[in-house]
Amino acid sequence: MNKVLIIGSGFSGATIARLLAEENIKVKIIDDRKHIGGNCYDERDEKTGINVHVYGPHIFHTDNEDVWNFVNKYGTFQPYTTRLKANAKGQIYSLPVNLHTINQYYKTALSPTEARKLIASKGDQTINDPQSFEEQALKFVGEDLYKTFFYGYPKKQWGMEPKEIPASVLKRLPVRFNYDDNYFFHKFQGIPRDGYTPLFQNLLNHPNIEFELGKKVNRATVEELITSEQYGHVFFSGAIDHFYDYEFGMLQYRTLDFEKFYSEDDDYQGCVVMSYCDEDVPYTRVTEHKYFTPWEEHKGSVLYKEFSRSCDKEDIPYYPVRLVSGNSIWNKYEQKAKEETNITFIGRLATYRYLDMDVCIKEAIECAQLYIKNNKE
């Protein structure tokens, strides 16, 4: 088979690289950052020795056993239960919204059945087919909980009114009528014991894989490489608008700024992530990184305040911004991508979707398997 070029070394690109390499296909990975792993990259904080998720919290969770088995080949996963808290109107609540949250908020002692009836009575039953985040929230939890927990936070995160955000975003946020405070409900949940970076090092440790880090590419660069180095196919996992030199304009993404600070206290906030739901607090959440590795012991603590803002060309894009009204610019890029014969677009940025890590891996496995099947010699 021909050599393959992969742009990006996050889970999408790295998974394809490994699977192709095991089929004796020569693979070259190019990444514009000076490290592998994409946004999953982590490193030891020099001052405290705590392992820091440099680009924000990454907890692995999935119901897909094949994906779980795949990542466990390259790193030992420590079971991990994600328990988050929310700071709203001067009170600390459990997230996701559960029976404890409901009883605390309404100052009640309701049973699960009673809580279901209460929330059902609060919901706006005139909304039959919610299209926006706001409609989804009003229909299923009512105005009280919406205004307290689901208005200010997404407005800060996405930079727009919740009525402009698609309803699908809220479907990622569960509501429970028991006291379960595990944020995720998936069968498999964990964090690599040694960190994500060593996992990626193991994943990409193969004689058929080579790297070039710290190099940006676009459509013209890729065409030159295809010609000069005889690549048979390209898998691209970067921002699709950058790839096409913003031919149809820049797509909307959100980027994140992190403000690092230290505490002499061994435990600063009592949980891994504290979300700040009030609109007048400029940051969305605070992450205390030592909670990612409770099996380790460190003096003091290192934390990140997380600020969300609109993404410029020189920023790192994190979240694609999908609008209820649609996106004509994305439609043009999507059509152009479909016309490519030797380039496959993979991952969150290239396909302009909000994807969890396990979905990126699942789709990458499918892409690799299809390529191998179609190129058997």
UniProtKB/Swiss-Prot annotation:
Pfam families reported in the protein's UniProt record? GLF (PF03275), NAD_binding_8 (PF13450)
User: Which residues are listed for FAD binding in this entry?
Assistant: 12, 31-32, 39, 58-59, 348, 355-360
Activity: how regulated: Inhibited by Cu(2+), while other divalent cations such as Ca(2+), Co(2+), Fe(2+) and Mg(2+) have no obvious effects on enzyme activity.
What InterPro entries does the annotation carry? UDP-GALP_mutase (IPR004379), UDP-GalPyranose_mutase_C (IPR015899)
EC? 5.4.99.59
Judging by the UniProt lineage, the source's domain of life is Bacteria
* Observed phenotype of the null mutant: Cells lacking this gene produce semirough (SR-type) LPS with only one O unit attached to the core-lipid A moiety while the wild-type strain produces normal LPS.
Report whether Isomerase shows up as a keyword of the record: yes
Q: What is the top EC class of this enzyme, as a single word?
A: isomerase
Keywords tagged on the record: Carbohydrate metabolism, FAD, Flavoprotein, Isomerase, Lipopolysaccharide biosynthesis
| GO terms of biological process kind | fucose biosynthetic process; O antigen biosynthetic process
Q: Which cofactor does it need?
A: FAD
Pathway linked to the protein = Bacterial outer membrane biogenesis; LPS O-antigen biosynthesis
Signal sequence range:
none
Temperature-related activity annotation: Optimum temperature is 15-37 degrees Celsius.
Tell me which family the UniProt entry assigns to this protein. Belongs to the UDP-galactopyranose/dTDP-fucopyranose mutase family.
Q: Which PANTHER family match?
A: UDP-GALACTOPYRANOSE MUTASE
Described by its record, this protein's role is as follows: Catalyzes the conversion of dTDP-alpha-D-fucopyranose to dTDP-alpha-D-fucofuranose. This is a step in the biosynthesis of D-fucofuranose, a component of E.coli O52 O antigen.
What's the name of the protein?
dTDP-fucopyranose mutase
The organism is Escherichia coli
Q: What is the lineage of its organism?
A: Bacteria, Pseudomonadati, Pseudomonadota, Gammaproteobacteria, Enterobacterales
